[in-house]
Amino acid sequence: MTLSWTKRLGGGQADCVWTDPPYGVSYEGKTKDKLTIQNDSGVDFQEVVADAFLQIVRCSKPGTPVYVAHADTARTFFQEAFEAAGCMFRENLVWVKNTIVLGHSDYQWKHEPILYGFTPGGAGRLGRGGAHWYGDNKQATVFEFDKPSRNAEHPTMKPVGLIEAMISNSCQPGGIVFDPFGGSGSTLIAAYDLKMRAVLCELDPRYGDVICRRFQEHTGIIPRCDGKEHDFTTE
């Protein structure tokens, strides 16, 4: 991974980061297509995520709020890699789903953690009671949102409402939300709904198409590719 994919942000412009990187669990979708995610196992996963945290620091303003969805089984790695990049870990938030995810664990998973913290720098207190906080005083660590049923497009799609609930506390309209693992495009749609701007990166062309198609279906705006409009809903 190089800086080439972050050129659109220039030097330190992101106001908020919300991202859903590979979890390192070799996840396979439950649909007939058995969708997978690149770099979702072993050393590849660790190197990609660790480098992404460094790029997040490069592309963000000092003290930028960062949200990182991850697997509970990989929590130690995510926090250590986050702090190794110079970021400050604040706390873990929890997304509680409306249904369990069947797997091989003794207790079936019904939640996912989201790491919350800040990029290096920033003056004074960061978060509630200080800089980069636009929510009220009643925000809790638990967020209850239904798991998206349309997983035929992406195996780990996140609900738009979940992302909106978090970034609305950390970014103002017109601000830039950065997602280096674009995935299904939920971050882009959430930012659009809140009148924010978004910059996404996605390695897999298949999911790049999903991002553009979901955005077009949600907004009616036809994306542009190489300077020309491209209708992704007809593919």
Language-model features and meaning:
Residues 1-208:
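Core catalytic lobe of class I
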Residues 1-8, 212-235:
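S-adenosyl-L-methionine
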